[in-house]
Amino acid sequence: MRAWIFFLLCLAGKALAAPQEALPDETEVIEDVTTEEPVGANPVQVEVGEFEEPTEDVEEIVAENPCQNHHCKHGKVCEVDDNNSPMCVCQDPSSCPATSGVFEKVCGTDNKTYDSSCHFFATKCTLEGTKKGHKLHLDYIGPCKFIPPCLDTELTEFPLRMRDWLKNVLITLYERDEDNNLLTEKQKLKVKKIHENEKRLEAGDHTVELLARDFEKNYNMYIFPVHWQFGQLDQHPIDGYLSHTELAPLRAPLIPMEHCTTRFFEACDLDNDKYIALEEWASCFGIKEKDIDKDLVI
């Protein structure tokens, strides 16, 4: 996989911004994307009028904003009802920040290009409870374009590149960590063994034949990276399963560059329940059943 793909996805894999879209029966608790500032960064300031003949000092009164700690999912914003209680309501797409470039556009599964993820989720919110809204998901980052079909031969090559990429992402994070807290101490200990292994295949645009041989030869190096990525995605909620929402931070940047992404993740869902369990995930990447260990998801 090319280096520029690697560095783009390295950031996406770690940031794990909030999940893109929640499936039915899923509770998604994330910050509103309409602003980069934390919700309720500044409490509402209540102005005090001036009196012509004040008899005592008038102190400024700071009222608590009910929305300060009330988080809404993508597409919704917090408002206060008549009882001064916070509630989440659909955001008006026209209130989304103006976009400045093509890279902010996103493509929905309806094959429609939206100006930004904010516009997409605000639109989707208005469709809640409808068949169209249930089927609508954020497909990938960037304007909609033709995605060629994934051939069977290409599908078998995809996990080879993905495994190598996951390993290299961890190594890069380890090398850049120092005081950045990119990895936990437990994760560092695992990656250190990979980093110090002289037999490790260096990052590069390798042939699928070389990647296949390296996986067979250095199989143990790939066990932890596969578990690690699962743990990075399994966040909302942390339940041992990956939903469409949780996969989005990984798949959305990948699809325009790796056209087998969608088919690969669909194939991983062996029981077609719309969720990918750890066992299904690890199996997709060629990890043997005896080496699948939930304790490695750290």
UniProtKB/Swiss-Prot annotation:
<keyword id="KW-0964">Secreted</keyword>
<keyword id="KW-0186">Copper</keyword>
<dbReference type="GO" id="GO:0005615">
    <property type="term" value="C:extracellular space"/>
</dbReference>
<dbReference type="GO" id="GO:0005518">
    <property type="term" value="F:collagen binding"/>
</dbReference>
<feature type="disulfide bond">
    <location>
        <begin position="107"/>
        <end position="144"/>
    </location>
</feature>
<dbReference type="InterPro" id="IPR011992">
    <property type="entry name" value="EF-hand-dom_pair"/>
</dbReference>
<dbReference type="Pfam" id="PF10591">
    <property type="entry name" value="SPARC_Ca_bdg"/>
</dbReference>
<feature type="disulfide bond">
    <location>
        <begin position="150"/>
        <end position="260"/>
    </location>
</feature>
<keyword id="KW-0084">Basement membrane</keyword>
<feature type="domain" description="Follistatin-like">
    <location>
        <begin position="66"/>
        <end position="88"/>
    </location>
</feature>
<dbReference type="GO" id="GO:0031092">
    <property type="term" value="C:platelet alpha granule membrane"/>
</dbReference>
<feature type="binding site">
    <location>
        <position position="275"/>
    </location>
    <ligand>
        <name>Ca(2+)</name>
    </ligand>
</feature>
<feature type="glycosylation site" description="N-linked (GlcNAc...) asparagine">
    <location>
        <position position="111"/>
    </location>
</feature>
<feature type="binding site">
    <location>
        <position position="271"/>
    </location>
    <ligand>
        <name>Ca(2+)</name>
    </ligand>
</feature>
<feature type="binding site">
    <location>
        <position position="269"/>
    </location>
    <ligand>
        <name>Ca(2+)</name>
    </ligand>
</feature>
<dbReference type="InterPro" id="IPR018247">
    <property type="entry name" value="EF_Hand_1_Ca_BS"/>
</dbReference>
<feature type="disulfide bond">
    <location>
        <begin position="67"/>
        <end position="78"/>
    </location>
</feature>
<dbReference type="GO" id="GO:0010595">
    <property type="term" value="P:positive regulation of endothelial cell migration"/>
</dbReference>
<feature type="disulfide bond">
    <location>
        <begin position="96"/>
        <end position="118"/>
    </location>
</feature>
<comment type="similarity">
    <text>Belongs to the SPARC family.</text>
</comment>
<dbReference type="InterPro" id="IPR037641">
    <property type="entry name" value="SPARC_FS"/>
</dbReference>
<feature type="binding site">
    <location>
        <position position="280"/>
    </location>
    <ligand>
        <name>Ca(2+)</name>
    </ligand>
</feature>
<dbReference type="InterPro" id="IPR036058">
    <property type="entry name" value="Kazal_dom_sf"/>
</dbReference>
<dbReference type="GO" id="GO:0005509">
    <property type="term" value="F:calcium ion binding"/>
</dbReference>
<dbReference type="GO" id="GO:0005604">
    <property type="term" value="C:basement membrane"/>
</dbReference>
<dbReference type="InterPro" id="IPR015369">
    <property type="entry name" value="Follistatin/Osteonectin_EGF"/>
</dbReference>
<feature type="disulfide bond">
    <location>
        <begin position="72"/>
        <end position="88"/>
    </location>
</feature>
<dbReference type="InterPro" id="IPR001999">
    <property type="entry name" value="Osteonectin_CS"/>
</dbReference>
<dbReference type="InterPro" id="IPR019577">
    <property type="entry name" value="SPARC/Testican_Ca-bd-dom"/>
</dbReference>
<feature type="domain" description="Kazal-like">
    <location>
        <begin position="84"/>
        <end position="146"/>
    </location>
</feature>
<keyword id="KW-0325">Glycoprotein</keyword>
<dbReference type="GO" id="GO:0022604">
    <property type="term" value="P:regulation of cell morphogenesis"/>
</dbReference>
<dbReference type="GO" id="GO:0016525">
    <property type="term" value="P:negative regulation of angiogenesis"/>
</dbReference>
<keyword id="KW-0272">Extracellular matrix</keyword>
<keyword id="KW-1015">Disulfide bond</keyword>
<dbReference type="InterPro" id="IPR002350">
    <property type="entry name" value="Kazal_dom"/>
</dbReference>
<feature type="signal peptide">
    <location>
        <begin position="1"/>
        <end position="17"/>
    </location>
</feature>
<feature type="domain" description="EF-hand">
    <location>
        <begin position="256"/>
        <end position="291"/>
    </location>
</feature>
<dbReference type="GO" id="GO:0009986">
    <property type="term" value="C:cell surface"/>
</dbReference>
<dbReference type="GO" id="GO:0016363">
    <property type="term" value="C:nuclear matrix"/>
</dbReference>
<dbReference type="GO" id="GO:0050840">
    <property type="term" value="F:extracellular matrix binding"/>
</dbReference>
<comment type="function">
    <text>Appears to regulate cell growth through interactions with the extracellular matrix and cytokines. Binds calcium and copper, several types of collagen, albumin, thrombospondin, PDGF and cell membranes. There are two calcium binding sites; an acidic domain that binds 5 to 8 Ca(2+) with a low affinity and an EF-hand loop that binds a Ca(2+) ion with a high affinity.</text>
</comment>
